[in-house]
């Protein structure tokens, strides 16, 4: 059964009920969508993901449940998202700082800078970006990627918050980050169709 975390207790799960925002389409399916997308990432594409599942309230409303990968035996590992690692906050990056700053190329440079086994994690990151593109997840912003301290070194964290956002947004985008794949930005107008060549160059 589920219960609230008590004062002084380190929670090990995160529960996400259906969002209350009325501008989101098909709100009742958000939990199932995220669970399915995460399962496809893990089982079909071999992407390391946070453990997750669906649970239901007494009124049969679905909620998404995920296990925190930064907590083990009641102790929290150090984790930093890419917005923090790149130095972006609301104060210096604007209200949409996690979307309008940086690119996925610059995210890869963060991995190169902080991760000892950078080549391995950059490959994992590349595969995750490709998956986000083909699964129509345009919520892959800077705070949805993290490095986690596993022992005495940092590594790319398991993937989390993967969801097909095209089912819930009136105007979904190709990429969550305004610059897209490259630090110099991309032409994402109607005349440019993002495809294999873009990802080959990114790789």
Residue ranges of predicted features:
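Anionic ligand-binding catalytic core segments
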Residues: 1-142, 146-203
């Amino acid at each position: 059964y589920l219960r609230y975390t008590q004062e002084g207790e380190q929670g090990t799960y995160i529960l996400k009920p259906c969002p209350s925002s009325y501008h989101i389409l098909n709100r009742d399916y958000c939990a199932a969508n995220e669970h399915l997308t995460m399962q496809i990432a893990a089982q079909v594409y071999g992407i390391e993901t946070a453990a997750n599942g669906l649970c239901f309230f007494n009124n049969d409303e679905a909620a998404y449940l995920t296990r925190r990968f930064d907590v083990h035996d009641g102790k929290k590992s150090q984790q930093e998202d890419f917005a923090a690692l790149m130095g972006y906050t609301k104060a210096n990056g604007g209200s949409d700082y996690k979307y309008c700053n940086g690119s996925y190329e610059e995210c890869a440079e963060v991995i190169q800078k902080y991760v000892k086994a950078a080549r391995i994690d950059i490959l994992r990151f590349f595969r995750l970006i490709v998956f986000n593109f083909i699964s129509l997840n345009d919520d892959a912003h800077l705070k949805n990627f993290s490095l986690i301290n596993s022992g005495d070194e940092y590594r790319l964290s398991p993937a989390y918050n993967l969801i097909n956002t095209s089912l819930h947004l009136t105007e979904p985008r190709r990429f969550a980050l305004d610059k897209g794949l490259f630090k110099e930005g991309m032409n994402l107008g109607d005349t440019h169709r993002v495809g294999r060549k873009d990802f080959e160059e990114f790789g």
